[in-house]
Amino acid sequence: MQRFFAHNTGKHETAIQALILLGAMLFFLFSPAKASAHPHVFVDCSLTFEFNDNGLAGVRQKWWFDEMFAAMILGDFDKNHDNILTPDEAKALEQGAFVNLKNFNYFTRILVDGQEHKQIEATEFNPSIEEGTLVYEFFVPLNIVDQDKHVVMVAIYDESFYTAVQMDPQNKVLGLSGKYKTNLELEPVSKMAYFYDQIVPEAAVLTLLPQ
């Protein structure tokens, strides 16, 4: 765990933000009001902005869970305990510990040119086991196809502190064609502030410049 920590020394304290995994609520009998004020689950999150021939298709997320939480979830879904998720096991895990996140926008907040992107969907969900820990991968479509300048901000957080999320300071751009030049940074975004505007999450900020 802490795969991004060494690259993020000196960053703002808000690099670690809250994410509550309500998709796993079958295993945690709590509500947000009952959650403790310090994290119990830790997630490293990396984002890849994916382009196709039309423009910015969307953002692929990859979450690595801490070993203790992963062991608990895999204990229920990796039925034969072989550290490989079969298609049936992966489907059961999706239904039992992921789909409920739809009710919470998958804890993903996106601003496009300062405006809220409200249609947060998740496709291509793929759980796996890497180096003994649980990994989620999924895709959030955006479909920005015009050739205007755009600024896209993506943050992963929730107003509960049950789970801490460490964002990758070196997120990626994939499949870029000659339509755009891009700049990608991880930085605090004050417009996303929450908890009485006292907490400012870090977001991956992608600037698209038409060529």
Question: Where is each model-derived feature located?
Answer:
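N-terminal secretory signal peptides that target proteins for export/translocation
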Residues: 1-15
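Sec-dependent N-terminal signal peptides
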Residues: 12-24
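Early extracytoplasmic/domain-onset interaction patches
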Residues: 39-64
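Long, contiguous binding/interaction regions
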Residues: 65, 89
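Acidic, glycine-anchored loop motifs typical of Ca2+
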Residues: 76-87
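Short, well-structured hydrophobic secondary-structure segments
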Residues: 85, 91-110
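Mature, soluble, non-transmembrane domains
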Residues: 107, 111-211
